Amino acid sequence: MKKLAPAFVFSALTLAVGVAAAQSQPVIGLITKTESNPFFVKMKEGATAEATKLGAKLLSAAGKTDGDNAGQVTAMENMIAAGAKTILITPSDAKAIIPAIKRAQQQGVQVIALDSPTDPATAVDGLFATDNYRAGVLIGQYAKVAMAGKKPVIATLDLFPGHPVGAQRHNGFLKGFGLTAPDAKSNHLGGAAAGVVCMADSFGDAAKGQTGMENCLQKNPGINLVYTINEPAAAGAFKALKAAGKEKDVVIVSVDGGCAGIKDVGAGVIAATSQQYPLKMAAMGVAAGVEYAKTGKKVSGYTDTGVTLIAGKAVAGVESKDVKTGMDLCWGNK
């Protein structure tokens, strides 16, 4: 790993630095939000495998933290200088990254968003991602049935304000649960829903998820349902609940479907999670980059890469797969 600037981490896989490298084989860049989140680790694995398969050179970079827009901008500039003709990016800041994307496109670079849309979504050439609103709806529907007969006292551990993915999952969960919620196009969290007693930002991080859950329990010790933006946040929430002696009284639902998260479903930490497929997103992005390098044909619009509800215990009226299936599928692992 080689650090080129303090704001981000930049690495090269089979990289010959310089524009000349692009003349012999396609050069494709992958910029993720962080390199510590298992989701983005798996995405990088998928991009690496597809690049090797198709004979492309892959550059990779990641912000230090989720929300590190400056690091992503610098990474993009370095990749263009190194000859990348397609850049795949999971935008940390859906709006702030737009000027850098426009500059790249003006230089003939195809820019494809993975997992997270930009704002507006049309700023990139294409988007390969989960339908995050549907992912939220699925776990909301599951939670509604799982909580039958109980008065819901809900906490949400979200990403951070204004991010499309965070809003779509949160609002989808509310919709699936039967509560008032903004539609899939809104980047604002629905917060006035009956039963939601606490909302906290976790940044998708286990430690911050634990802190957020602790704070929510202080506000309302009677919380019995927790939505989390992802499985690391869910794991943090469970730690807080266990420390308070409440882990058996609370249903946790989440999104991601990574192998570690599916194990947590099997262990009863998470009741159900919506599984997405970063390996598929990355592979499709690399393939599109190779196609552009060879033919000049760009991708366009949104491609749904799929979502599956994985549950520890099936509930009536909500289609789901079991833990074994989730482990077989986790993030496209097999």
Where do the model's predicted regions map?
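Gram-negative bacterial Sec-dependent N-terminal signal peptides
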Residues: 1-22
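A residue-level marker of the well-folded mature domains of exported/periplasmic proteins
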Residues: 3, 21-334
